[in-house]
Amino acid sequence: MLYQQIAKNKRRTILVMAGFVFLVALIGAAVGYLFAGTATGGVIIALVIAVIYVSIMVGQSTDVVMSMNNAREIHSADEAPELWHIVEDMALVARVPMPRVFIIDDPSPNAFATGNNPQHAAVAATTGLLAIMNREELESVMAHEMTHVRNYDIRLQTIALALTAAISLLVNFAGNFMWFGASSRRDDREEGAGGVFAIIGSILLIILAPLAATMVQMALSRQREYQADAGAVELTRNPQGMISALRQLQHAEPMQNVDPASAALYISDPQENARHKSLSGLFDTHPPLEARIERLEKM
């Protein structure tokens, strides 16, 4: 059952990422059609911009994300013995190198992993997590984060952030020159019904693209959390430890200072109380904790 769930989530993730790339190409086509009269050129430019953003983000992700979240690095077990040794143990079990370890001074229990690959990864835990969780719960949380590292989720989330930023750049460009572009298209004497509908469709796509990108990014984050929960059980052989940790997180208050751009990285939504989720769930960075617990209980 465990390995079937992991395989299922991996297939879903591939579909989500394919949708992300398709969205980048689609917005590029719309921008290209509006301003140059050719969709092909826009697609090429959009994909090039996306590749550049991804390359920059992947190379600098750890330091940037840790700085955004006011995390301080610890360099030895002397500074946080229990956390250090648990991370060390979970990395050994997951067969990944020991990641860099950071602590965030915040009373709300939470944690996340970041980096571009298992060889250049980092994990962070809040002081609230260290104060509230017992050893089994903390092991499960770190095993959850090690699963993100082992499965390259950290790189995947970085790519998703970069693609969202690329789409925002394209949309901002289109918005700044919208009327100029539309006028240019009219000057090309393509004022027939088909041309008008194409222009209107392109404009609507540009307007809705950021919303769609956010929805795709959130869907990606939600699927990775389910998989990381299953991976934590695989590493610890202790489903009750993970269930207990998630129950602790159900009572957590929002973090005091967190960058919205990195919210999807955390094990639980750091921006709002877990008991108050959106009705549709489409814009939630994480699946409901109760749903995650139910899946673990069925294993």
From Swiss-Prot:
Cofactor(s) needed for function: Zn(2+)
E.C. designation(s): 3.4.24.-
Entry's Gene Ontology BP terms: proteolysis
Transmembrane segments: 14-34, 39-59, 159-179, 196-216
Membrane topology note: Multi-pass membrane protein
MF annotations from Gene Ontology: metalloendopeptidase activity; zinc ion binding
InterPro entries assigned: HtpX_protease, Pept_M48_protease_HtpX, Peptidase_M48
EC primary class: hydrolase
A cellular component annotation (GO) from this entry: plasma membrane
Active site (UniProt): 145
Subcellular location: Cell membrane
Family indicated by similarity: Belongs to the peptidase M48B family.
UniProt cross-references to NCBIfam families, sorted A to Z: PRK04897.1
Name under which the protein is recorded: Protease HtpX homolog
Gene (UniProt): htpX
